[in-house]
């Protein structure tokens, strides 16, 4: 495969964070930018401008972020001297992102920063705000000319870089996604839009492509002839925490399935691009979404299960039900669990079921893909109980990131009994581990480089919503069941029914080499 396209870091840049006083900024964005600063991966002349309704002076804002760095960086990563250097380029502007009257003030503040760091107007806008502001901010930026890139030079580079990063969810359904795309098209070009999905910033997610397309031993087997089924799990062992107001309007399907899990399905199922560049890679993602087999209402009822966690005794204490959480209605029908069986109608995957699930308050926190290969056509060897050993490839996204190949080996001694063994690759042992803030650091760096490969394109957003919309519509009917499951369990028992009769979900634990356990290690 030809080499990746080359992208260049500008010499100067201002990163403008809408929602600069919010949770995402202090937990993820600032720690990730600090990591890039330590690695000399930021532009030579770089500033951050935080925006928000909270009143901060520049000094108070830096102190607030310094506390966040000490709290959210991994042990040993915080350096007081480096943090001071990094934060010296951070500024704050109190303003209301929803108010058009405040944007001339933003424009003037950016001019001041441009003069301070000799910046020709290169800006990246990061929308770390409630989704209700996603349609407002681009229009207000355009009203004061902060969307315009200017004339291109002989290398095709604009005189002023203007990019905008939008957090998920991008739309609430297909119609709202289309409307949002139309709003952005009026103010920005597609190449300026970076719809971020932090799952794609994880090294282990990107390693799916390396595993498939950089190794000749896997790709010949990566099809309906050798793979029996694919299973993708992304679950958490905590509830909604302080996100009650947001989560009750969103639910697990919008929060996780339509974006994160759909992307994992696409990376697992996509065809190899001719070369690894943004458009060719994203074209293949869209083709997978186009191949999702639509489900009739009857098929949705058989193949999709939704659930909501109920109270239980777990971890030695009482766990309250979802409906007892803060800012949640006592009769809420918002799902905290989704399990689904879907098919991809194309040459490679025809007839192979993809089982996906996500949930809150599960026994452990884990995201992994399990490729189940078909058994041998004739059983020559068997285990002690007479069964055959299935071949599986486990791709652990998080935690204990790595890849494990499960296969049969002969038990030493007389006879020909076999047992399941594994060959394991872990990032900790062979790559020196992964830095904290890894996913956001990678995606922020890509955005500054102008590489949109790992960001979602508008047509992919709409194609994904096109598949999931009928499910959401059917859920509006009162008779569609919402099953309860005790907090700390693997979801409603009804989710087992969507797996083929002879199969069951793989319930992993956090230790890659002991995937049949589901304890928290």
Indicate residue ranges for each PLM-predicted region.
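Secretory/organelle targeting and membrane-embedding segments
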Residues: 1-166, 170-521
